Every structure is written in C-alpha cells, then in structure tokens.
From Swiss-Prot:
Source species of the chain: Mesorhizobium japonicum (strain LMG 29417 / CECT 9101 / MAFF 303099)
Sections of the chain in a coiled coil: none
Presence of keyword Plastid: no
GO MF term set: ATP binding; ATP-dependent protein folding chaperone; isomerase activity; unfolded protein binding
Isomerase keyword on record: yes
A Pfam family the protein falls into: Cpn60_TCP1
Lineage: Bacteria, Pseudomonadati, Pseudomonadota, Alphaproteobacteria, Hyphomicrobiales
InterPro entries in the cross-refs: Chaperonin_Cpn60_CS, Cpn60/GroEL, Cpn60/GroEL/TCP-1, GroEL-like_apical_dom_sf, GROEL-like_equatorial_sf, TCP-1-like_intermed_sf
EC annotation from Swiss-Prot or TrEMBL: 5.6.1.7
Localization of this protein: Cytoplasm
Protein name per UniProt: Chaperonin GroEL 1
Cited PROSITE patterns: CHAPERONINS_CPN60
Quaternary structure and interacting proteins, as annotated: Forms a cylinder of 14 subunits composed of two heptameric rings stacked back-to-back. Interacts with the co-chaperonin GroES.
GO cellular component: cytoplasm
Binding residue positions for ATP: T30, L31, G32, P33, K51, D87, G88, T89, T90, T91, G415, D496
C-alpha cells in the first residue's frame, strides 16, 4: 500500500476551494444567451467546441491531487444534475461554488460546519417548496418551443423543431438526436409502432421501386412460437382469403415449408401476405407481442393462454389501417386498438418503469411505452464541419431534456430570476442558533449567483441587475441578457423548467454542504520516478 499525504482543516479547504474555483471559472463562461464557447483539445481529431457546462466539467482533471478532489466533487454536481434534469449543469456549478466559497469563509472564522450544513439544507428545502409552488404548467406547443429555444441558447429553429416533434409523438414518445449526413438539420417522424424486424423473404415485396411491402387494411396474426408448416393455419388462411384483405404474420420465425407455401400463394396472387419475425428476445419478445396485440385489437396466439393455431378465428386477428415493411423495419400505422385498452397498457408499463432498478430495463420499457404512445421522432443534426455538428448536437440534447422537464413539472421565469425571487421564502426563516442562521444566509446570497453570472457574461455589471430587480415588486420582471433590457420573463418567453432549477439547487446544496464539513483530505503521495540508468563508460561504444 502506497504512502498517503494528508491535509487538515483550513489547508485542506483552501486547496479544495482552489480546485473548485478553477473548474467553475471554466464552466461559468458558458452560462446564458451570451455565454462563450470553450475549446477542448482531443487526443485525435479536431478540438471540440462547446457551450455545454457538463461537457466542459467532465474534461477537467487537475495536476494537484487536493485541488483535483475539489474539482471532481463539483463535477459530480454537474453530472448528477445532467442525469436527473438533463440541463442546468452550469447553474448547478455556479451555485455550488458560491455556497462553498461563503461556507469556507465562515468555517475559517470559527463557525460550526455541521450547523452551517443544517442551515444550508433548511434553506434549500424552503426554496424548493417555493419554486414548485410558483411553477406554471406548460400547455401549448408555443410554450414548449420557448423552453427549447432558451435551452438551445436562443436558437428558435431548434425550439420549433422540438415542439413539432413532441406534438407528433406525444410527451411519452421517443425523440432521438442523431448526426446527419447533410448540412441541414431536419426532423423525421415515424408514426405508429415500429420495430426492427424486416420481411422474411424479398418475394413478399409489393412496391419494387422502394423495395418494401405495403399492406392496406391488413389483418395481423400474432403468434408466439415458430411456424414450420401451415396445416394448422389453413382454416384461418381461407377465412382471410374470403375477406379479400391482406395478412401480416408476426411470429418467432416462419421457416421451411411454411415460408415456401406463403411465398407461392403471394406470387400466384391468391393471398396478399407478408411474414416478419417477432421483435425482441425471451420475455421481452412476449411482452412486445402483447403490446402489438393491444395496439391492433388482436389476440396473441399462445399455448400458454390455451389458444391453439387451428382454433383461431378471424375475430382473434389484429387489424391496422396500414403496414409498411422494409428490409430491416416493420411499421404498424393506426392499429384498431381502443384508446382505453392502449392507455391501460401504457399505465402498466409506466408502473414497471417506476419499479425497475436496471437502467437497461428502464430504457427498453421506455421504448415500448413510446411505441404504444404514438411513435418515434428523430432530429438529424446537420452542419458544415464535424465540430459544428457536435456543438449543435450538444445544444439540441440540452433543449430536448429541458422541454421534457418543463412538461413534467412546469416552467418558472428564466435567466436566474426564479432563484432570485425565491429568496422571499427565506426572509422569515431562522435557525436554531446563530450558525444555522448563517447557513441560511449562505444560500440567500448564492441565489443571486446565476443571474449575476448571466449579466456579466453579457457585459453588464451583475450588482446593478440584481439591485434593479430587488427593487421591483413584479415577480416576473427579469434581465433579458440577449437584448440587455428588463422585461416580463414569462411574456417574453424567457423561461426555465422548474425541474431544472430545483434539481440544480438541490444538487449544488447537497455537495457544497458536504465539502464545507470536510476536515481532512487524503491522497496518494506520487511515486518518484526511478533515476535514469547511467551512460556507458569508455570503451563501451562511446567512442
């Protein structure tokens, strides 16, 4: 075990605070509409240019081990806020640094760190209640666009695109962000349920130009096991032929004789049919087949449920308005399932999401939820250079997370105004003793930090902005840093999701309060490099 270096009390806190300040100084320049870019060197390829606080924080590693410990703890604030709310990382970093800076001063002056921590926790809890109470529910597509625009650093096209995507796929729908092959940024929406299985034989293709199967008003047979021969299916196939409608078969696999018979029938024109493999594996496959059954108002044919293939009637088949099958994907559009049964299934999946502890399971359940709820939207981010695409993708990711958070918990005035106004929740709050009250005052001062930084990044003195807003009785009045004017933030569309503001403060308060109470820091003593081997003497090749 290697020897350790230990720092105590003021010495430890000073070194830790230095690391926090270095990280915060690099991150805080990105805050607000006039925030600056940070250029990050990469081991290979072009440097990365970003205005995303968490991306900057994740790149910072300091040479001094004690300074680095402080920086890494605040980096944790940014990461945690990003994981929970998806945005607000720079705000969280600025708040944490402010709380820690003030707290370290008071500890150095002889105050009790544990009492200061109690005061900080008490104040944060009171402010969170205030933010939740003041949050306004997001109702219109225009409000969603405003949130997206602010989170994307004032890019209105991004805000409009996200609002359109959410409008198409619903609040539970999946919206993914990918890099495009072109210079344009575009939105691609897949309506209905899509899964990643294509046709089992190219002979099923009905549209030779696009190499895809198009079935109008088809019946859908959902079968859990493999189909090896069609003997058991003959009654249902005859019933489908008489109905004159096409048939989509979804099963674990269709092989050998069964597949050959279907292909021959399709080519002869007797039966419009296509077969695809069931999506997923194991228990997840069964669950997805049940989802398809709910969506199409059909029944899953499973011997576990006591249903045999030879006993299937046409009423047990699912129905859809349209089915499109390509080489690798199948899309079921406008299934016949009733709204009530689909909503019941959605509620069941939401319950499973809340119960599961596995991130992987959660992601897969979320995908199933989206497919049932309305579809998938893909925002393809274009740009002239790779650096531009990556920078834009960072902003769109932030904007997407912010809009989801806004839909979840509502919006509050943006630009740091919500935190500044939330100081009113602390005006009558007193601690059990003077040190606890001092902890409350630390948070009171820290609530000004984000708006000060936004003002300073736009070239305006922060104290003047804070003073002017403090004098006003209008709770929505704030500083529009883009145009350097004072406006009603809600009317001007400068809003933040309440969840982002709340999470940023909670995470900042939690980590900063812990760091204030740290009394010792321990790190490895760096190993000294071994002395280089001596050079060869005379006659050893050193002519």
């Amino acid at each position: 075990m290697s020897a350790k270096e230990i720092k105590f009390a003021t010495d430890a806190r000073d070194r830790m605070l230095r690391g926090v300040e270095i990280l915060t100084n690099a991150v805080k320049v990105t805050l607000g509409p006039k925030g600056r870019n940070v250029i990050i060197d990469k081991a290979y390829g072009a440097p990365r240019i970003t205005k995303d606080g968490v991306t900057v924080a994740k790149e910072i590693e300091l040479a001094d081990k004690f300074e680095n410990m402080g920086a890494q703890m605040v980096r944790e604030v940014a990461s945690k806020t990003n994981d929970l709310a998806g945005d607000g990382t720079t705000t969280a970093t600025v708040l944490a640094a402010s709380i820690l800076r003030e707290g370290a001063k008071l500890v150095a002056a002889g105050m009790n760190p544990m009492d200061l921590k109690r005061g900080i926790d008490q104040a944060v809890a009171a402010v969170v209640v205030e933010i939740k109470a003041k949050a306004k529910k997001v109702k219109s597509s225009a409000e969603i666009a405003q949130v997206g625009t602010i989170a994307a650093n004032g890019d209105a096209t991004v805000g409009a695109m996200i609002a359109k995507a959410m409008d198409k796929v619903g609040n539970d729908g999946v919206i993914t962000v990918e890099e495009a092959k072109t210079a344009e940024t575009e939105l691609d929406v897949v309506e209905g349920m899509q899964f990643d299985r294509g046709y089992l034989s190219p002979y099923f293709v009905t549209n030779a130009d696009k190499m895809r199967v198009e079935l109008e008003e088809p019946y859908v047979l959902i079968h859990e096991k493999k189909l090896g021969n069609l003997q058991a299916m003959l009654p249902i196939l005859e019933a489908v032929v008489q109905s004159g409608r096409p048939l989509l078969i979804i099963s674990e696999d269709v092989e050998g004789e069964a597949l050959a018979t279907l292909v021959v029938n399709k080519l002869r024109g007797g039966l419009k049919v296509a077969a695809v493999k069931a999506p997923g594996f194991g228990d997840r496959r069964k669950a997805m087949l049940e989802d398809i059954a709910v969506l199409t108002a059909g029944q899953m044919i499973s011997e576990d449920l006591g249903i045999k293939l030879e006993n299937v009637t046409i009423e047990m088949l699912g129905r859809a308005k349209r089915v499109l099958i390509e080489k690798d994907t199948t899309t079921i559009i406008d299934g016949a399932g009733t709204k009530a049964t689909i909503q019941a299934r959605v509620a069941q999946i939401k319950g499973q999401i809340e119960e599961t502890t596995s991130d992987y399971d959660k992601e897969k359940l979320q995908e199933r939820l989206a497919k049932l709820s309305g579809g998938v939207a893909v925002i393809r981010v274009g740009g002239v250079t790779e650096s531009e695409v990556k920078e834009k993708k960072d902003r769109i990711d932030d904007a997407l997370n912010a809009t989801r958070a806004a839909v979840e918990e509502g919006i509050v005035p943006g630009g740091g105004v919500a935190l500044l106004r939330a100081r009113s929740a602390l005006s009558g709050l007193n601690g059990a003793n003077a040190d606890v009250t001092a902890g409350i005052s630390i948070v009171l001062r820290a609530l000004e930090a984000p708006i000060r930084q936004i003002a300073e990044n736009s070239g305006v003195e922060g104290s003047i902005v804070v003073g002017k807003l403090a004098d006003s009785k209008d709770h929505n009045l704030g500083f529009d840093a883009q145009n350097e004017t004072y406006v009603d933030m809600i009317k001007a569309g400068i809003v933040d999701p309440a969840k982002v503001v709340r999470t940023a403060l909670q995470d900042a308060g939690s980590i900063a309060a812990l760091l204030i109470t740290a009394e010792a820091m321990i790190t490895d003593i760096p190993a000294k490099d071994a002395a280089p081997a001596g050079g060869g003497g005379g006659g050893m090749g050193g002519y």
